[in-house]
From Swiss-Prot:
Source species of the chain: Caenorhabditis elegans
PROSITE patterns recorded: MOSC
Catalysis: reaction(s): Mo-molybdopterin + L-cysteine + AH2 = thio-Mo-molybdopterin + L-alanine + A + H2O
Cofactor: pyridoxal 5'-phosphate
GO molecular function, one term: pyridoxal phosphate binding
Name by which UniProt lists this protein: Molybdenum cofactor sulfurase
InterPro entries documented for this protein: Aminotrans_V_dom, MoCF_Sase_C, MoCo_sulfurase, MOCOS_middle, PyrdxlP-dep_Trfase, PyrdxlP-dep_Trfase_major, PyrdxlP-dep_Trfase_small, Pyrv_Knase-like_insert_dom_sf
Biological process, per Gene Ontology: Mo-molybdopterin cofactor biosynthetic process; molybdopterin cofactor metabolic process
N6-(pyridoxal phosphate)lysine carried by residues: K208
Amino acid sequence: MPYLDHAGSTLPSKIQLEEVAKQQSQLILANPHSHHATAVKTKQIVNSARLRILQYFNTTSDDYFVVLTNNTTHGLKIVAENFKFGQKTHSILNIASVLHGGSSNLGYLYDSHHSVVGLRHVVNGKVNSISCVNEESILEHEIPDVEHSLFVLTAMSNFCGKKYSLESVHRLQEKGWAVCLDAASFVSSSALDLSQQRPNFIAFSFYKIFGYPTGIGALLVRKDSAHLIEKTSFAGGTVQSVDEMSMFFVLREFERAFEEGTLNYYGIAQLQKGFEEIERCGGISSIRNLTHHLCKNALYMLKSKKHPNGRPVVEIYSQSEQFENPDKQGPIVAFNLKRPDGGYYGYTEVEKMCAIFGIELRTGCFCNIGACKKYLGITSEMIQENMSKGKRCGDEIDLINGTPTGAIRISFGRTSTEHDITALEQMIDTCFTEGEHQAQSKPDPMNIESYSPTVVNLFSFPIKSVGSVGRKRYELTARGFKNDREFLIVNDDVTLNLKTHPELCMLTATIVDDDQLLIQTFDQNENLVLPMSLSLKDNGAKLVCKNTIATMDCGDKVGKWLDNALDRQNCRLLRVAEDSKKNFVNDSPFLLINEASVYMLSRYINMEVREILTRFRSNIVVRGLPPFIEDTAKRLSIENLEFEVVDKCTRCEMICVDPMTGEKDPSLLLALRDYRNKQKMTFGIYIRQTNFESGQYLESGMSVNFSTD
């Protein structure tokens, strides 16, 4: 698997996980707040972990405390919530772009993770200024003298991998700033030597370094800076004495005062295997050298890509000379892909193509809006305007008015190889530099009402993500075709779908005589018949596509049949509860596609129409329209049945699954991309009935009328 998201989370090695499993099978631990032998042993393991952490950063317990946290964000919030700012004298009207002098200030770089930026709202009622600055404000300009002030410094950009000079730590401290280092990205591939650099606070997460365990981080606090943060509340395990009837309480020693509740002691014990893994790799310096080498090679590969007209395929968001020096650049490349005409491919489109090739990377702004704004030329006004147009963090809106709303990020770790770069290059060559085709011209949208299409095929999918054999006639319900997406396969309580489990395409399901569910393997060698009237066991609520739906379990016999058919263990077939108003449909009750549009794709890639229909998994297929004209419809009627168009259907790598083999073939999605060009790879329209009445049916041969009003 070409994995290029080590900045998101690096991967644990097989040996590391095997060692953890062996340790867990033999190690019995208990709550370290207790005093019996197992609890005492656990406490010793926790304290040994603190010492090992300090050793890793080349310091000792004489110089730093180790507060164990949940993650980097948790550590940063501990500092911000408890930092002893001075007296607040005035309100903050805006975020400053320069550092302010005086008392009680917060500063951070524009290139900061949202976990840093969000601290401004933690301290807003305590400080006199909040400043968001660039590195030059620290290294090249005079820093104003301050007291009782905190600067949260990014060690390495999680957006583009730029390493910020740790000289800033000393320069800020000389002027009275306490410095909290956000080291989350930096420590994943670089050594932080605390005998050379001495921030007041350092926050990081261990999964960034080891890949496993998750949910464990640390806040290192310089002992001569411990007086800068003061705990004013308490929780379980943090007090020496407390009285519930008065405000009296006395906190424990420094580290334990900030470690609220019971520590994740099993996770802490597993840190040992993470440190051993780093040593097996030759130490963090060897990892830095490996990842720097791979990152440089990836950069050179990306820069070499040209369209036939000579224009670059890749726009890179870093200065190339930084990649020559591992002290200035971490193992991250942020970029976007460009069209031959100079426009941009949306990063969602790129991500879908990567999924076909099995490449895993990150897209978006990576929780770093400041860097995103700088490198993509986005303004504060554009952010708010984009929000009004529906843009949200983590969604698929990747271009607005032709401008990218985010980028593509690749990043390397200790398990990375040249193969990862080769796979990315093959994907770019196949999908974005070769086989460029002109988008097909579409008919005048106003002509749609002059056509007289009819329904030619109908499909219902009783089991979500499983195939259908189709029928000529279906009864309608308030939630779509009767029995459509009424069943769902889960494995160890995880929902199976085609995107993650393409073997589901080897099954088909249909309702026979309205009273039996027939499940067959694709070759029809095995089948299972389930009476629809079967009394089922309540299985509780199930979260499907953001909806919580009450379900019932179809029993052990069905589960065992699915285990055999899918070569899995612990499969279960769930059915929507009888009184549920929802089924397992993702977006809309019906998906309608145009047979002529299917035919155009069929001719283009030499794939049979029937196979394309199978891959597109529509409910309704109409005949008698020019290709792609259905995009212009707002409403339609199928004889006396009225429907409204909800949205276009944006396609993903699911249509690339070969129903005969379960393997992924990118040709169909590539053809769709070329035909649609800048239409977001949509195909088909989602529709919803607006005049439903009990007893209605939809059948093949019915006439269809479209409206663009």
